[in-house]
């Protein structure tokens, strides 16, 4: 370049214009640009544009819009070129704010956004085209502050003309990845700019909501890498039941963590860290941030781009099935695309882990994506792999036509089920014959003849008539056992809840917990055979300390035992009343939804007597309560038992029916006779037991 410059003195903080001489003054702007890259200046973008003018509209779109469309409005520079973004593949236009939804009950917390500091990621000149290397494990996106400006090469733009140039991801499906980190301390503080922090993560904004929690965008204070962090209130998770056979929603979180810990594939979202402080109410799941958002857009997608996305999904889905995981909620909202056009599967909250066969027994998932066999009122084994393949076909249909194939005319679930079971999809526009054939095989209503993953990989449309083959997977099969699900987080399993666990303030998940008695939230223990044992032992100790109070109730116990005997005799007649209960519930669900797993149990040494409004016994279980066996005969009921230790109230929850029930302790002393109408009943435990734990 022919430039000579003097070295700055130690006390100088930046280059001065007089410290260098340039033989060719045309290079002055370039030197200034380099100087500002190193030491910072607000005019760096203007200098960059002067030195490296836009040569084509495509290059301009890629350079100027990448950093404005990574899902960070507050991280844009002053040159707002959103209106000039002509990227036809819609990768950068999908911000993904609402695409981190997942299958837990909605948390009503609303994020109190603070002003976001200006953080600039400076692009550098595009290098000369080089042969495309073997794909490498993707690193988290990196952002930098004004005081630390680091050039970043813009991601490669994916278009309909170069998508076949990407190498198959199957060859790196087994690449080495460090084990996700587990942290048992959550140190909460404020960043110097006012943003909330947990450990080294600085929270920026909320990306989306799900059931029981939210997802926030954060960056690592030291590395400036971006992450998506799921935040859950463990008390709320523990208190909520998700249906018959499911004790609480915390199991779903444990299962998702266990599955993500095992996953190591380019087309599956990565888990980096789990922060689970036993003294805090919240658990934080640090995941890979996918800046492009959902693959779904408001516009129809070309077959070429849809094929590229579809192949990525097939690779990821094949990997999940090889790992004995059924996703069960495959849909565009759970298929995220990064800036390089790579699709990644996320949200394993309702996923199913199978051992010898892939049979699923419930229809948890989005109704519009349910397979016909899940919508029929039949009791037969259902292949989980076939369910995922059907959802794959519906997702491809959404990509091509920007709508779902089965739409209810009355906004009724039953109408959607009828459309799925009894009607064929329509095709709004002309598509290729190969794609039409693939749709017919993906959306085959007979699960026995529906196309399988191996056939999808060799289909003419997927491979462009064999010119773009999909290679075989090369990876190590890793199974997820039930014990690994229980041990997904290994902590001391009690926390100190806040005074009000139902607060709607968003600060609650990022502020220190107040003092209080243990709420009995359980993770797992290597010595535990059940995730509830620790709470059980504590309850037994508390029960022993309450013997004096219990002795005062002996007379009442004798009367109660007589009532129990009468109730047990009435229980023999309960089957005759089941139909009337179903009619009262006004709930109509597929038979597959009421299939029960027998691994559900509540806490030890507790009896719950539940009667209907005519005082007929519904269930009477003790020692290790398993009312599911009794309620299995009553289709549509959602029985829940979850009472927190030392809390002012807890939830006794139903989804249908009207009941009067007696709640008793392990000595069969009557605690209360209450009525439950439909969905929700707050039950005051302190009033009856003086902080004694009950379930």
UniProtKB/Swiss-Prot annotation:
Q: Where is there biased composition of kind Low complexity?
A: 149-160, 510-528, 542-580
Q: Which domain of life is it from?
A: Eukaryota
The yes or no answer to whether the keyword ATP-binding is present is: yes
Biased composition of type Pro residues is found at 124-138
State any single GO MF term.
Answer: ATP binding
Per its UniProt entry, what is the enzyme's top EC class, as one word? transferase
Instruction: Tell me the protein's name.
Output: Probable serine/threonine-protein kinase DDB_G0279405
Q: Which organism is it from?
A: Dictyostelium discoideum
């Amino acid at each position: 370049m022919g430039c000579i410059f003097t070295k700055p003195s130690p006390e100088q903080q930046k280059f001065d214009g007089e410290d260098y001489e340039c033989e060719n003054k045309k290079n002055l702007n370039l030197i200034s640009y380099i100087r500002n890259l190193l030491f910072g200046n607000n005019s760096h973008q203007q200098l960059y544009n002067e030195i490296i003018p836009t040569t084509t509209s495509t290059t301009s779109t890629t350079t100027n819009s990448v950093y404005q469309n990574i899902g960070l409005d507050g991280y844009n520079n002053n040159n707002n070129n959103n209106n000039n973004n002509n990227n036809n593949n819609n990768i950068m236009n999908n911000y993904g704010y609402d695409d981190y939804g997942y299958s837990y009950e909605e948390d009503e917390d609303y994020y109190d956004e603070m002003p976001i500091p200006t953080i600039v990621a400076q692009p550098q000149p595009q290098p000369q085209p080089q042969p495309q290397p073997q794909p490498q494990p993707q690193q988290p996106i990196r952002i930098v502050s004004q005081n630390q400006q680091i050039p970043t090469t813009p991601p490669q733009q994916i278009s309909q003309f170069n998508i076949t140039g990407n190498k198959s991801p199957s060859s790196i499906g087994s690449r080495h990845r460090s084990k996700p980190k587990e942290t048992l301390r959550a140190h909460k503080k404020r960043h110097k700019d006012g943003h909330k922090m947990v450990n080294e993560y600085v929270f920026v904004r909320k990306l989306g909501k799900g059931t029981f929690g939210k997802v926030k965008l954060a960056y690592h204070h030291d590395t400036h890498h971006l992450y998506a962090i799921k935040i859950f209130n463990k008390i709320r998770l523990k208190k909520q039941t998700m249906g018959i056979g499911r004790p609480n929603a915390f199991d779903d979180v444990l299962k998702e963590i266990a599955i993500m810990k095992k996953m190591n594939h380019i087309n599956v979202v990565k888990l980096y860290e789990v922060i689970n402080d036993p003294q805090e109410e919240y658990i934080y799941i640090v995941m890979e941030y996918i800046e492009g958002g959902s693959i779904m857009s408001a516009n129809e997608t070309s077959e070429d781009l849809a094929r590229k996305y579809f192949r990525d999904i097939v690779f990821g889905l094949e990997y999940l099935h090889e790992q004995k995981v059924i996703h069960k909620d495959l849909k565009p909202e759970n298929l995220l695309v990064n800036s390089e056009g790579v699709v990644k599967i996320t949200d394993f909250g309702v996923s199913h882990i199978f051992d010898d066969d892939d049979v699923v027994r419930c229809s948890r998932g989005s109704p519009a994506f349910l397979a016909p066999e899940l919508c029929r009122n039949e009791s037969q084994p259902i292949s989980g792999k076939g369910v995922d393949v059907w959802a794959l076909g519906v997702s491809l249909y959404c990509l091509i036509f920007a709508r779902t194939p089965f739409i209810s005319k009355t906004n009724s679930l039953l109408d959607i089920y009828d459309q799925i079971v009894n009607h064929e999809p329509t095709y709004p526009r002309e598509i290729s014959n190969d794609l039409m054939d693939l749709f017919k095989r993906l959306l085959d209503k007979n699960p026995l003849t529906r196309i399988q993953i191996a056939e999808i990989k060799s289909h003419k449309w997927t491979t462009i008539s064999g010119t773009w083959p999909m290679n075989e997977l090369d990876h190590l099969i890793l199974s997820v056992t039930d014990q690994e699900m229980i041990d997904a987080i290994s902590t001391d399993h009690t926390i100190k809840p806040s005074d009000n666990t139902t607060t709607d303030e968003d600060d609650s998940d990022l502020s220190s917990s107040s003092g209080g008695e243990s709420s009995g939230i359980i993770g797992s223990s290597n010595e535990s055979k059940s995730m509830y044992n620790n709470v059980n032992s504590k309850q037994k100790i508390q029960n022993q300390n309450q013997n004096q109070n219990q002795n005062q109730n002996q007379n009442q116990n004798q009367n109660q035992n007589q009532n129990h005997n009468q109730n047990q005799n009435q229980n023999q007649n309960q089957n005759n009343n089941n139909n009337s209960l179903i009619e009262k519930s006004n709930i109509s669900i597929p038979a597959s939804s009421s299939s029960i797993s027998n691994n559900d149990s509540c806490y030890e040494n507790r009896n719950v007597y539940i009667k209907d409004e005519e005082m007929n016994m519904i269930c009477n279980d003790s020692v290790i309560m398993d009312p599911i066996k009794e309620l299995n005969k009553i289709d549509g009921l959602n029985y829940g038992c979850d009472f927190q230790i030392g809390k002012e109230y807890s939830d006794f929850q139903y989804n249908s029916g009207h009941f009067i029930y007696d709640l008793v302790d392990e000595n069969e002393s009557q605690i209360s006779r209450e009525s439950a109408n439909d969905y929700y009943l707050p039950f005051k435990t302190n009033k009856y037991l003086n902080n004694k734990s009950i379930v």
